Regions:
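Extracellular/periplasmic catalytic domains that process cell-envelope and extracellular macromolecules
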Residues: 1, 34-35, 61, 106, ...
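Mid-domain, small-residue-enriched loop/turn segments at the edges of structured enzyme/sensor domains
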Residues: 1, 20-77
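Flexible glycine/proline-enriched surface loops and loop-helix/loop-strand junctions
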Residues: 1-2, 10-16, 47-55, 127, ...
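Secretory-pathway/luminal and periplasmic proteins that interact with or process carbohydrate-rich
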Residues: 13-17, 40-44, 97-101
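Structured C-terminal helix/loop/strand segments within mature extracytoplasmic catalytic/sensor domains
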Residues: 69-96, 121-178
């Protein structure tokens, strides 16, 4: 449990690598995705190499739609027992990464958890991704996945890149408010 919690809450790459090894390596994780009904997402490398994302490279890829569908199925009880699902949702709500991404554009009274993804390496463009499960008061859960390619390389994730994802969440908020 502690490895999964660290991988989720603070994006601990070492913890994630240990979990991936326990699941049979990247191929084992990809096989699990297939078992869960995700025919798109694939894992091919360990951290930190999977953060090196080249435009035409299919390794370590997914789509926002595939990830949103998978997260919806995991977090709404279709794939996990209730206690495991509740534990994961708690970790997602306690996640310390991504506070300036999708979460920043959602109302504070919406119960929200997230998981970020970031790709950056010299010679590539920064990728700034986030997925949230959020519950507006009195409403059903909503899953939002947004992936942003900044078109540039910077040594750190820039707040202006994260702001694009916050704007996506504001648009969803306006849509939900109707």
């Amino acid at each position: 449990g502690r490895l999964a919690q660290a991988a989720q809450e603070i994006s601990d790459g070492t913890a994630a690598n240990l979990l991936v090894r326990r699941l049979g390596g990247p191929a084992g994780v990809t096989a699990r995705f297939r078992e869960m009904g995700d025919s798109v997402t694939r894992l091919d490398r360990y951290e930190p190499d999977l953060g090196l994302v080249l435009s035409a490279d299919l390794r370590d890829t997914t789509t926002p739609a595939a990830m949103a569908q998978l997260v919806r199925r995991i977090t709404t009880g279709e794939l996990l027992q209730r206690d495991s699902r509740d534990r994961l949702l708690g970790w997602m709500r306690n996640t310390r990464t991504g506070v300036h991404r999708l979460r920043a554009g959602l109302p504070e009274d919406w119960l929200t958890g997230n998981k970020t993804g970031t790709g950056r390496a010299e010679g590539t463009t920064n990728k700034c991704n986030d997925i949230v499960i959020t519950v507006p008061p009195g409403r059903s859960p909503i899953v939002i996945a947004a992936y942003y390619d900044s078109g540039e390389y910077t040594p750190q994730v820039e707040r202006r890149h994260e702001a694009v994802l916050a704007e996506v969440a504001r648009i969803v908020t306006d849509w939900v408010a109707g």
